[in-house]
């Protein structure tokens, strides 16, 4: 047989042998590769030095959620500047840090560093986004925020969009226990390095959506909003603007009536009720925004270096 014919015959027989063996090879590979569920159950590698990894079999790495389930009140401090030493100190004695972007000049690059610093200090980072659009919410979640704070909510559509932009549309694809709604795209960026390799399939169960009720229009739709929108985790009575937009003050009969309406609706729907830390003794309130920077908490910004 000519040499070129022998080579052709060999290639044909070799190809046939691979076709026969392929099902067995694929089966072996499938049995060797862990399923998504098995990957979640396996102890993950620590994402960063000193970071608590996602525990084996655990789907909750947001400790605020754990504490709420335990019936605890949740406290925070608020930061409005980029000083990372202030951010570290802000974590002392509280459950989460409120990173203020609506009423500050913080850039997204600065906020990303603040989120990382807060997480590495053992605290949960929340971000009040400047606006409730997809771009701002995407940046906050990709940077690793586990609480998305939506200001001045006064429409059902705005609340629904806030939830959609905060959640992945994964449904039952990777995690059958994940809350399924969402329109968030899968950039992830810094978040997995902070919260571990199980982040993507567990994010929907760990990213909390907090809406702020600040004006009479928001008060008027609160019942419909909570009836129609699935995925609102926390509703906060934003006490200052609540009075500013209502033309009254805390303690006035009109103010108290609006606050009661919001409070009763939130509690009726089983949602966490939030307010300023000065309201910690009021019935029904479970989560609180603490003071800003060094106003009353006692932690001080890092002094400027001498020139």
What are the residue ranges of the model-derived segments?
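Hydrophobic faces of well-ordered beta-strands that scaffold small-molecule active sites
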Residues: 75-79, 97-99, 125-129, 148-150, ...
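Conserved N-terminal beta1-alpha1 strand-loop-helix module at the mouth
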Residues: 52-125, 132, 164
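Catalytic cores of alpha/beta
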Residues: 87, 132-146, 150, 157-158, ...
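N-terminal amphipathic alpha-helix/helix-capping segment at the start of soluble metabolic enzymes
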Residues: 44-76, 191-205, 261
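Short beta-strand/loop segments at the ligand-binding rim of alpha/beta enzyme cores
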Residues: 65-77, 119-128, 201-214, 261-275
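Active-site-adjacent beta->alpha loops and helix N-cap segments on the catalytic face
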Residues: 57-61, 103-117, 132-137, 154-173, ...
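Conserved anion-binding
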Residues: 147-229, 239
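Bacterial N-terminal signal peptides
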Residues: 13-27
